[in-house]
Regions:
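PLD/PLD-like phosphodiesterase catalytic module centered on the HKD motif
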Residues: 1-147
Length: 147
């Protein structure tokens, strides 16, 4: 269990082990965080990664047009060579999904995963805006839950 250095432990260190796909299930997520992450991948990976994002609380809190358009713009934009593809989808049927999972895979096989309170938003990963608690979890179980 850990509450410090989440950005490196969850978003960047797994890249050093040759991971090529990050699947994120987040209760809340923003295009700003996705854009920040893509920009900060610069020179941090030897081969391009695929990013899959599912935003879970849409049935409960809805999603603004500007947030949806922000995700659309990122998904359809020219990506840097560090990113092979970005997919973004939303849970639209109830019940809403309040879980937060970050699953790293290599060649389609889940290798490491994290769960906890950190949403995929900048206030969880950038700066010291609030405390978050995350833990490693079983990657196969996390992947099964994600799917």
């Amino acid at each position: 269990m850990f509450s410090t250095d989440l950005t490196n432990k969850i978003l960047f260190e797994p890249l050093q082990s040759g991971m090529d796909e990050l699947s994120i299930l987040s209760a809340y997520a923003t295009p700003n965080m996705l854009s920040w992450y893509i920009k900060n991948l610069f020179h941090k990976t030897a081969s391009p990664i695929k990013i899959n994002l599912i935003v879970g609380m849409v049935p409960f809190d809805n999603l603004s047009v500007s947030v949806h358009e922000g995700f659309q713009q990122i998904v359809s934009s020219d990506l840097p060579h560090e990113v092979s593809a970005v997919q973004c989808s939303y849970v639209i049927d109830k019940p809403a999904e309040h879980s937060n999972l970050f699953i790293w895979s290599r060649q389609g096989q889940p290798q490491t995963a994290f769960s906890g309170s950190a949403n995929f938003v900048q206030s969880s990963f950038v700066g010291n805006h609030r405390r978050e608690l995350m833990m490693q979890c079983d990657p196969a179980e996390a992947s099964e839950y994600y799917d």
